[in-house]
Amino acid sequence: MSTETESLTGSKGSPTGPPQMKKNALSYASNIVIGVASTAPAYSLAATVGFFVLIVGVGVHSPAIIIVSFIPLFFIATAYKAMNEVDPDCGTTFSWVSRAMSPSLGLLIGWTVILSDIVVNANQAQIAGSYGFQLFGLDNAASNTLDVVILGVIFIVGLTWICWRGIELSALTQQFLLGFEMTLLVIFSVVALIKAYSGSNPASMHVTLSWFNPFQMSFTALLDGVLLGVFLYWGWDTGVSVNEESENSNDGPGKSAVVSTFVLIGIYLLVTVASQAYAGTKYLAANPDDIFAGGLSKGVLGPLHFLLTISVLTSATAATQTTILPAARQALSMGRRGAIPRRFAEIHPTNLIPARATIWAGVLSVIWFIAISIISSDVLADCVAGLGFLVCIYYGFTGFACTIFYRYEIFKSVKNFVTLALMPTLGGLALMGVLGYGLYFYGQSDNDSSAPFLGLGVPDWIAILGVGGGIILVIIRRFQAPEFFREPRQKYGDTIETVTREDEFAPADSML
């Protein structure tokens, strides 16, 4: 039996026992790259901006929606930074909520993190499959569900293999994919703005400050927009989930989360403003599923318009890979603490990655993707809306956990109060408000793409699966591993011991 002693004041001992993930494998820049890539900027913009415009009362104010959506998520990013400074655990939200609030709640919230990763992988695989065929002019295959599923599964399997090979290969892949994606988005935006002001498109509009003013919308329109905005920003926390493999693990990953949110708001505003200025709101509203697929990309980039297709493809590909990373590490942390079977904490002796957890993250993603695709593509779209509910839950509770964990520190200075209590709590409350409104909104049958089941829409069922499934998991594990649930609540300054039994680990090469 090995014992890891960890002081929750920002320092960490040197644990012995089973293999650990590779230390200092990722730089601060790699943390930012992984965090930004996980949000799939090109795909998120292509599939979201048009829907902003479609919301009654939003129109030209899409940039204002992006700004307002940024605020609560920036607040939560500061909570990630504060918690990572004292507990750089790859389980992030699971670890922090279980220690600050309760082990039962930590396991429930940790389950929603894993479920959100699995749910979104299906959508990203569908995009990768469809765009992969479009890139080569195979439009019939791109619209054929079976063909798209087969190619999407190949993408998931290939990206799971890259994650399996090691974190450094994963980071290198991300740098290439994100570099190409961001370069194309910037070039597209600059050219679009130049053409908008040159008058080459009669529908072009000049940018005005009113576009950025949220007070020119109704509160209902603003809430509807923020429901989408949460999905737009989700994913930057992946850069924190690889903290144990990062340089300066206490500080770098947390700072990267905050920086990632600013990178995202910058590129989102640039592309949204440029697209709206060049094409106008009528075009964006007419092409909500993919604003780049119509005449926008051809009008801006001419014969090079196919590069935007590649950009969206690389975006979905990068996001699929970076979604496998946090799911596996969340399971690793849970297994290490005994919240789920300890075999999920296996570390591959050569690749130094979560062995069983990585494979199961890929397997469950494939199973979910195939199952949802068989039901309906509309269900797949509604699952993305439900994903926003899961994100609100686990981001929100991360904010609450931060305030509770630092409860005896928050009144020691104004800075502490603002960064450790006010911002995390406001961020959490805002996301709980969005969650409540979203449950009401998607509870109305008119707001679902697919038919309701037992009176509820698919997004609501995703939320029920998240909370209900988590409760069932907690009940089962209370009987199977009661020692985890006896762990006391922690606060800043406490020292804990995490006990790991080597005899509970099977060899990493015998995972299946």
Indicate where each model-derived feature is located.
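Membrane-interface "cap" regions at the ends of multi-pass membrane proteins
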Residues: 1-60, 73-74, 78, 476-512
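Helix-loop-helix junctions that connect adjacent transmembrane segments
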Residues: 17, 24, 59-66, 137-147, ...
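C-terminal membrane-solvent junction of multi-pass transporters and transport-like membrane proteins
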Residues: 29, 344-351, 395-444, 453-458
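Extracellular loop-to-transmembrane helix junctions
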Residues: 44-148, 260-263, 458-470
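Membrane-helix boundary/coupling elements in multi-pass transport proteins
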Residues: 89, 112-127, 233-246, 268, ...
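Helix-loop-helix connectors at the membrane interface of multi-pass transporters/channels
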Residues: 95-99, 125-150, 179, 184-185, ...
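TM-loop-TM module centered on a large, flexible mid-protein loop between adjacent transmembrane helices
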Residues: 95-97, 102, 134-139, 212, ...
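Membrane-interface loop-to-helix entry segments
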Residues: 147-202, 257-261, 388-395, 405, ...
